[in-house]
UniProtKB/Swiss-Prot annotation:
InterPro entries: Aldolase_TIM (IPR013785), Glycoside_hydrolase_SF (IPR017853), Hyaluronidase (IPR018155). One of its GO terms (biological process) is hyaluronan catabolic process. This is Hyaluronidase-1. The keyword DNA-binding does not apply.
Length: 449
């Protein structure tokens, strides 16, 4: 009965969005008057400090941690060894903390997590992204396939040792029940602790939600990009996780096999569509902010995204109504002076200019359509409308002097531009505002803020 209720709720929200009506307002943006932001989550500290290569992140409207560090006041990412005593098996086959969640003390984990949060985020007024990256196992038994099947096998073995008198069938049922109960407690209580300690942060788990639409390698031209129905149903069953999250962190990493292809857009679009669906069903008062993880280079390579794929990732993310995009990167970006220079060249070329284009266009649309009280979202999510600066009306220039380098947008919105925006985009008002153009105070929402 509970699962049926969740499905009905999800279907209702989906229909509301399809009809061009947002079921609920959005949370106010992370920074005032910035409806769509781009954040940097790559360990590139060595570029400016060691190699004296400034990546010019600030120049091109990218928000980064102080010294371009991986974790800090803007984004802090918690890997398995950074937060509590996370039970798991790593990629090398090493065992940690009882391997499975039902074989480790939750109290011990939370006590350690508390000290880890204080260590990694000393500022109690932290207002950044708190991203927990736990990918070794999934909280749902049926999603632990492939290499993750070891957690099911270990759980069965654990249950058998505790209850040798039970039949195989009962052992498996018990193992599943105890595993999912413990996994839920670990994830939920960790999240609630983090939110209690740093209540102004945006907390959630990396790669949640996922939609498992990775079959582009086998489907070829038959690939649709759609999330399998079973995976959407499983996401519905994680309502407890969405309700306790204060942000969602899906990813849209592109492998090089997808370079400049129709399949790349299908892959990204449906992952975003599922994330926005989950964001709308998580709470009653506002849709969760969605910060989408992407890479400026193709996954597992050091090859920059093409202009087309920048549109596919950054452009699609903004048009679908996400709060921002987070560029993640590896140590390779800052491994040598040449690596740093390669990132800088890309930043000063297609990447930086496109980021300025989209972030500025999102801001202009928010001003023109939503009176700065909401963000622009496609009227029809499957359309090909993008939040881009109109080339006949705007131009991007980069000015530099002895102290700073800045990308500046010059121009003004023409009537034909405004007509295009009104035809293709609608406003998702921030909490406290309502109306077609977010022109009215919403007393009900203001009381909730």
């Amino acid at each position: 009965m509970y699962h049926l209720w969740i499905k009905c709720l999800a279907a209702w929200i989906f229909l509301k969005r399809c009809n061009g009506v947002h079921a609920m307002p959005a949370k106010a943006p992370m920074y005032p008057n910035e409806p769509f932001i781009v954040l940097w989550n790559a360990p590139t500290t060595q570029c400016p400090l060691r190699y004296k290569v400034d990546l010019d992140l600030k120049t091109f409207h990218i928000v980064a941690n102080p010294n371009d560090s991986l974790s800090g006041s803007v984004v802090t990412i918690f890997y398995p060894n950074h937060l509590g005593v996370y039970p798991h098996i790593d990629e090398r086959g090493h065992f940690f903390h009882g391997i499975i969640p039902q074989n480790e003390s939750l109290t011990k984990h939370l006590n350690k997590s508390k000290s880890d949060i204080n260590r990694m985020i000393p500022l109690k007024t932290f207002h950044g992204l708190g991203v927990i990256d736990w990918e070794n196992w999934r909280p749902q038994w049926d999603r632990n396939w492939g290499s993750k099947n070891v957690y099911r096998n270990r759980s069965i073995q654990f249950a058998k040792e505790l209850h040798p008198e039970l039949s195989e069938d009962k052992i498996k049922r018990l193992a599943k029940k105890e595993y999912e109960k413990a996994a839920k407690s670990f994830m939920r209580d960790t999240l609630l602790l983090a939110e209690e300690m740093r209540p102004n942060g945006y907390w959630g788990y990396y790669l949640y939600p996922d939609c498992q639409n990775y079959d582009y390698k086998t489907k070829g031209d038959q690939y649709t990009g759609k999330c399998p129905d079973i995976e959407m149903s499983r996401n519905d069953q994680l309502l407890w996780l969405w309700r306790d999250s204060t942000a969602l962190f899906p990813n849209v990493y592109l492998e090089i096999i997808l370079r400049s292809s129709d399949n790349a857009l299908k892959f990204v679009h449906h992952r975003l569509k599922e994330s926005m669906r989950i964001a709308s069903m998580a709470r009653e008062d506002y849709a969760l902010p969605v910060f989408v993880y992407a890479r400026p280079f193709y996954a597992y390579t050091f090859e920059p995204l093409t202009q087309e794929d920048l549109v596919t990732t950054v452009g699609e993310t903004a048009a679908m109504g996400a709060a921002g995009i987070v560029f993640w990167g590896s140590m390779q970006y800052a491994s040598t002076v040449d690596s740093c220079q390669k990132v800088k060249t890309y930043m000063n070329g297609p990447l930086g200019r496109y980021i300025v284009n989209v972030t500025t266009a999102a801001k202009i649309c928010s001003h023109a359509l939503c009176r700065k009280n909401g963000r622009c979202v496609r009227k029809h999510s499957d359309s090909n409308a993008f939040l881009h600066l109109f080339p006949e009306s705007f131009r991007i220039m980069v000015h530099a002097n002895a102290t700073e380098k800045k990308a500046i947008v010059k121009g003004k919105l023409e009537l034909k531009d405004l007509i295009y925006l009104r035809k293709n985009f609608m406003c998702q008002c921030y909490q406290g505002w309502k109306g077609l153009y977010c022109e009215e105070y919403s007393i009900k929402d203001i009381r909730k803020i």
